[in-house]
Amino acid sequence: MSLADSVLAVNNDLPIRTDKPVHSGKVRSVYWLTESDSRRLINDKGYKVPLDTPLAIMVISDRISAFDCIFHGEGGLQGIPGKGAALNAISNHWFKLFAEQGLADSHILDIPHPFVWIVQKARPIKVEAICRQYITGSMWRAYAKGEREFCGIRLPEGLKKDQKLPELIITPSTKGILTGIPGVPAQDDVNISRQDIEANYQAFGFESLSDIDLYETLLKDGFKVISDALAQLDQVFVDTKFEFGYVTDKNGQSKLIYMDEVGTPDSSRIWDGAAYRDSKIVENSKEGFRQFLLNHVADADVLLNKDRMPEREALARDNALPLDAMMNVSRTYTGVAEKVTGKTITLAANPKADIIAILKKNYGLID
């Protein structure tokens, strides 16, 4: 088995039966099933959703993105070995814990393969729900320049870089480009306040004002569940991004659920606890890869300056990263997954062939 063959880099070309275009994101691809296949699976598999619920196959890849670009490595390595399986395993673990502790359900109905989720269609909240327990990254850079108000929250004077904040804070941003909302620029990833959300809750996808309280509760409770569990592993849960949406349950009632992924090295910052106590930062998340890139390229401004996006895209496209750097990232992701779940992440010789075989034999989704 070659290392390159074990990586699933292209995940939008599987022969899954669908009558809609495949939606491809930076890491995942979504195949919406036909109405008849959705109904058949709901019946055959006993999924606890209404019969008319649209279902999708969500396939994760091993691609790695940073600074809005996809990077690759030497030797034809088009992604990070084990990354996709690690991300799914971590999310599966936290989603299960959330449900067991009575927080809320997720969009996942079934897990046919380490790279694959069967999900129900949700009506997404158009908010990136970001929770911070420490001041670092972009927040610290802004604070160091004199900013004190973040998303309507005022921080005290005298905070130090990487310090624990007095309390957990929520700093939401827009998900996608939203138009026609007073005071909110029509740009992706714009910081917003709770007041912005309350004044325009329907435009952000909330069905009621009270659901804003519920979303904040689920965000804080979910953060605490993950933070407490990671602390047992001597890991520090620094900050994270959650996503939420609505689904209709079997009784026809709308309910708020967790979506996308949670508590992963892609969506969170995680620090090594022993190193932090020694006043050092050891990143166990994608932040380590970002820092590597900033030190690796000749001109870091290319990665940071949005006005230089064409140069950045060319840099990512034309430069293969060292194999040892890619494998360091692999060890970070699989290491976190194995700590969190207690299970080994195994590389498959040909993950795409495995996925096709399972979806054909066990789910009848491939002709």
Swiss-Prot record:
InterPro entries: SAICAR_synt/ADE2_N, SAICAR_synthase_Vibrio-typ, SAICAR_synthetase_CS. It is an enzyme of class 6 (ligase). Gene3D superfamilies: ATP-grasp fold, B domain, Phosphorylase Kinase, domain 1. It catalyses: 5-amino-1-(5-phospho-D-ribosyl)imidazole-4-carboxylate + L-aspartate + ATP = (2S)-2-[5-amino-1-(5-phospho-beta-D-ribosyl)imidazole-4-carboxamido]succinate + ADP + phosphate + 2 H(+). Its EC number is 6.3.2.6. CDD domains: SAICAR_synt_Sc. GO terms for molecular function: ATP binding; phosphoribosylaminoimidazolesuccinocarboxamide synthase activity. Keywords: ATP-binding, Ligase, Nucleotide-binding, Purine biosynthesis. GO terms for cellular component: cytoplasm. It comes from the Bacteria. Pfam families: SAICAR_synt. One of its GO terms (biological process) is 'de novo' IMP biosynthetic process. The keyword Nucleotide-binding applies. Pathway: Purine metabolism; IMP biosynthesis via de novo pathway; 5-amino-1-(5-phospho-D-ribosyl)imidazole-4-carboxamide from 5-amino-1-(5-phospho-D-ribosyl)imidazole-4-carboxylate: step 1/2. Belongs to the SAICAR synthetase family. This is Phosphoribosylaminoimidazole-succinocarboxamide synthase.
